[in-house]
């Protein structure tokens, strides 16, 4: 109770002291204002006195004197108020001093009466022990046949609590011996070494310099005896700094050398790539085509075959030839492949390559013949250049081994027909053409859909695009209903008519090569070697598809 009253008296003294300080500050401000007014009135009175000496009229002198008297009166009032305020300030300062003295006395009493946390804990223990309660032993004494060694659970719990609360019986979980060197000039402590000790073997020898309930620090001299007298206690900051230095010293370990990470081989699973068939680079160098004496249309076909894809365009027709290039020995080896009529919106696949390109002046596409009309042989033209002849002599191809390495020999090969030449059998050529039995089997494969075919037929015109300007134009005849290809007669005039019906057979072409020139409208369109102009052959094929006949 006494402590509470002292605390209350101290708080009241602090409050009174604060009020007095505020009054003193206000009075000092008032004094400053009065002093400024006093100085202003003094200056005004001196100026009026100086002006009064130069005035000769009586009325003005009387007015100036009255004003001067009023100013002098105000000056006296201000001087008195300033003196009074200064006296009040002195009284307030004395009262503040008395309150401060009283506050200091109360604070001293509080320090003498105030108890620490340890004192409070001890007093609570003493009160618990002094409290009059019935003994537990008396309760269990009435129980018969109870062994003397039996300890009630409540009593055992109290004993355990006393052991835990007792500071002397506390066990250290971790102990460490730290050697510290202290600089007496700067006061800095340096950790020399730190040795962990077993907590069971640790003995609190030395002088306790720090204890916060969780950590205890004992000062021991170098000979493991108590430190010299006059050892001061350590501050929490110093203890934390020592523990930090000790932990850093323990964490330091010798450098372990190992192979760098980048020295180990790195194995990364390869990403499977999609198989795409694209024409290889330098296609014309890899596949050397020996052709001499062919027409302009054939040369354009060879050029376009090396450049990539080309599209034959007619009126409302798109012809796309997916024919991969194939090398051949010394002579032009070709296979004409019949293509289907497809809609205009059909896209070209990446593997498709064309063998011919439509001539700007020609009214029809380049010629394409049946695989049955494919021929192979030796090509030697009389007007061929010396360079081509040297290449023919140096380069000897085998038709089987001249294929690209990525093509299987067992799979069928697509060949392109480029024209006819006279071929002569010789023993020398047969030696180089080992593995070639003289026969190449070719077949015409047509893949179509009946629905697409019907749609395509609906879009096809019944006459050739340039037929009105041609000499062989005839009006279209009404066509019967479409039937299946297997049931249609080869001689019927339908859109499914074979395109090779009106083409020249091998025997007829051989006869035309040896026969004299006939005077026909199309004889002028022949090449220098006697073969038929490819544009005329293409016109024949186109007219054959449309059911017309070229004379």
Swiss-Prot record:
Signal peptide: none annotated. The modification Phosphoserine is found at residues 135, 321, 370, 384-385, 498, 515, 520. Residues 12-106 form a coiled coil. The keyword Aminoacyl-tRNA synthetase does not apply. It is found in: Cytoplasm; Cell projection, Dendrite; Cell projection, Dendritic spine. Phosphorylated. Keywords: Acetylation, Cell projection, Coiled coil, Cytoplasm, Isopeptide bond, Phosphoprotein, Synapse, Ubl conjugation. Residues 248-259, 484-495 have a biased composition (Basic and acidic residues). Residues 248-280, 342-392, 449-535 are annotated as: Disordered. GO terms for biological process: regulation of cell shape. One of its GO terms (cellular component) is dendritic spine. InterPro entries: Paralemmin. The keyword Cytoplasm applies. The modification Phosphothreonine is found at residue 271. Ubiquitous. Most abundant in cardiac and skeletal muscle. Its main location: cytoplasm. The modification N-acetylmethionine is found at residue 1. There is a cross-link at residue 179 (Glycyl lysine isopeptide (Lys-Gly) (interchain with G-Cter in SUMO1)). There is a cross-link at residues 125, 179 (Glycyl lysine isopeptide (Lys-Gly) (interchain with G-Cter in SUMO2)). It comes from the Eukaryota. Residues 270-280 have a biased composition (Polar residues). Belongs to the paralemmin family. PANTHER family: PALMDELPHIN (PTHR46881:SF1). Interacts with GLUL. This is Palmdelphin. The lineage of its organism: Eukaryota, Metazoa, Chordata, Craniata, Vertebrata.
């Amino acid at each position: 109770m006494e402590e509470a009253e002292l605390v209350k008296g101290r708080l009241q003294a602090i409050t009174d002291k604060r009020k007095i300080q505020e009054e003193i500050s206000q009075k000092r401000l008032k004094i400053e204002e009065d002093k400024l007014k006093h100085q202003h009135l003094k200056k005004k009175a001196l100026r009026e006195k100086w002006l009064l000496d130069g005035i000769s009229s009586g009325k003005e002198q009387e007015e100036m004197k009255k004003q001067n008297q009023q100013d002098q009166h105000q000056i006296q009032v201000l001087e008195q108020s300033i003196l009074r305020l200064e006296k009040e300030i002195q009284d307030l300062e004395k009262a503040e001093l008395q309150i401060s003295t009283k506050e200091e006395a109360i604070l001293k009493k509080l320090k003498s009466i105030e108890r620490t946390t340890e004192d409070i804990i001890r007093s609570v223990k003493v009160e618990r022990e002094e409290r009059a309660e019935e003994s537990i032993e008396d309760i269990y004494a009435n129980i018969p046949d109870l062994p003397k060694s039996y300890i009630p659970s409540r009593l055992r719990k109290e004993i355990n609590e006393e052991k835990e609360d007792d500071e002397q019986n506390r066990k250290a979980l971790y102990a460490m011996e730290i050697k510290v060197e202290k600089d007496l000039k700067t006061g800095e402590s340096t950790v020399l070494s730190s040795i962990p000790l077993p907590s069971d073997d640790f003995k609190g020898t030395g002088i306790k310099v720090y204890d916060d309930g969780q950590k205890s620090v004992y000062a021991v001299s170098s000979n493991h005896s108590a430190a010299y007298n006059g050892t001061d206690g350590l501050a929490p900051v110093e203890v934390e700094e020592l523990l930090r230095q000790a932990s850093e010293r323990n964490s330091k370990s010798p450098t372990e050398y190992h192979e760098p990470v980048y020295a180990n081989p790195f194995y990364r699973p390869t990403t499977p790539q999609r198989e795409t068939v694209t024409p290889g680079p330098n296609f014309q160098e890899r596949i050397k085509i020996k052709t001499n004496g062919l027409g302009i249309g054939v040369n354009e076909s060879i050029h376009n075959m090396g450049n990539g894809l080309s599209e034959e365009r007619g009126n409302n027709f798109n012809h796309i030839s997916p024919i991969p290039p194939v090398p051949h020995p010394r002579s032009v080896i070709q296979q004409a492949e019949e293509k289907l009529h497809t809609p205009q919106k059909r896209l070209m696949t990446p593997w498709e390559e064309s063998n011919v390109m439509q001539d700007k002046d020609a009214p029809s596409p380049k010629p394409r013949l049946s695989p049955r009309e494919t021929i192979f042989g030796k090509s030697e033209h009389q007007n061929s250049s010396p360079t081509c002849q040297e290449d023919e002599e140096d380069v000897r191809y085998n038709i089987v081994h001249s294929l690209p390495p990525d093509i299987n020999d067992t799979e069928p090969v697509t060949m392109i027909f480029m024209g006819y030449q006279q071929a002569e059998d010789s023993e020398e050529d047969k030696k180089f053409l080992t593995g070639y039995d003289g026969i190449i089997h070719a077949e015409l494969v047509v893949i179509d859909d009946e629905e697409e075919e019907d749609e395509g037929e609906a879009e096809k015109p019944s006459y050739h695009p340039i037929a009105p300007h041609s000499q062989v134009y005839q009006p279209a005849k009404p066509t019967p209903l479409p039937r299946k290809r297997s049931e249609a007669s080869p001689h019927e005039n339908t859109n499914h008519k074979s395109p090779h019906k009106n083409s020249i057979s091998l025997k007829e072409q051989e006869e035309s090569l040896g026969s004299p020139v006939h005077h026909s409208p199309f004889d002028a369109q022949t090449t220098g070697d006697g073969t038929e102009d490819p544009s005329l052959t293409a016109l024949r094929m186109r007219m054959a598809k449309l059911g017309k006949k070229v004379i």
